[in-house]
Amino acid sequence: MAAAFDREKALEHAIAQIERAHGKGSLMRLGDEARAPIDVIPTGSIALDVALGIGGLPRGRIVEIYGPESSGKTTLALHAVANAQRAGGIAAFIDAEHALDPEYAKKLGVDTDNLLVSQPDTGEQALEIADTLIRSGAIDVVVIDSVAALVPRAEIEGEMGDSHVGLQARLMSQALRKITGALSHSGTTAIFINQLREKVGVFFGSPETTTGGKALKFYASIRLDVRRIDTIKEGQEAIGNRTRVKVVKNKCASPFRQAEFDILYNVGISREGSLIDMGVEHGIIRKSGAWYTYEGDQLGQGKENARNFLRENPDLADEIEKKIKEKLGIGPRVDAPIDLTVVER
């Protein structure tokens, strides 16, 4: 009994010593306080928010969005930026590809006047800028577009054709080790957009892999695989893409869920299209033949007409969205203000 008392006393003394050296809360018992709910930034697609299991992209974590070219990766990231800004947050976009279109970003709802943008010359510069912004505690979301464009300084300064094996992977590994802890303390969401490459000589399994080595796969709490699966047409004219996102990795909820939604050209993710799809799936909107109805009121014949009707009647769209979210138990409206001040800065 005395030995147990002495051990407890020694432990309390050790905890007090650790807190004096490293600050209060640096060591605690897991059961001392109730775990706070995960704060999120909505993605812009209610279907994807549901697939993520927590209602959006988690704050204070690393998110990787990858897929083939023109699949909607940057569009998805910009919608997250727009939602963070709409809630009063500050966003940064590190444009390593030097390809950000401000006009397109504005159409998606991004406040381009207040968006912090950097077009770095090297991978080291890009990641140092990201690290400084994250450690400031003032940024809600930072997007790095893309990992493939984070070219190490040695490669840029070297000759064309020089071998630089593993330089980018080492750079990413070092940077992620540094920023992971800072993200947790600042509550910043770091979104890394990544490209696909093919592994040579793979006969079994998928030959596809992402750039930048394996570090990002380990450090990311969420990994989203974005694919374009169909073209949306109005008559003979293509007006958008049908997109499928698979949650390949999820440390916050169950992984391997999928979401499908429409991305319309010069519009972005179709909120109304997602509401129609989810409403029909969960019995809130009735589909009879080509007609869509809600509580006896006709929304339109065909999905495009129903989409236009909801766009012209935002109050009705809000009502449908509220019912879907209440039924599924997920967070606030995708384009409504959300509280981004939960994490102390």
Swiss-Prot record:
Signal peptide: none annotated. GO terms for biological process: DNA recombination; DNA repair; SOS response. GO terms for cellular component: cytosol. Its main location: cytoplasm. CDD domains: RecA (cd00983). Gene3D superfamilies: P-loop containing nucleotide triphosphate hydrolases. It is found in: Cytoplasm. SUPFAM superfamilies: P-loop containing nucleoside triphosphate hydrolases (SSF52540), RecA protein, C-terminal domain (SSF54752). One of its GO terms (molecular function) is damaged DNA binding. ATP binds at residues 67-74. Keywords: ATP-binding, Cytoplasm, DNA damage, DNA recombination, DNA repair, DNA-binding, Nucleotide-binding, SOS response. Belongs to the RecA family. Can catalyze the hydrolysis of ATP in the presence of single-stranded DNA, the ATP-dependent uptake of single-stranded DNA by duplex DNA, and the ATP-dependent hybridization of homologous single-stranded DNAs. It interacts with LexA causing its activation and leading to its autocatalytic cleavage. This is Protein RecA.
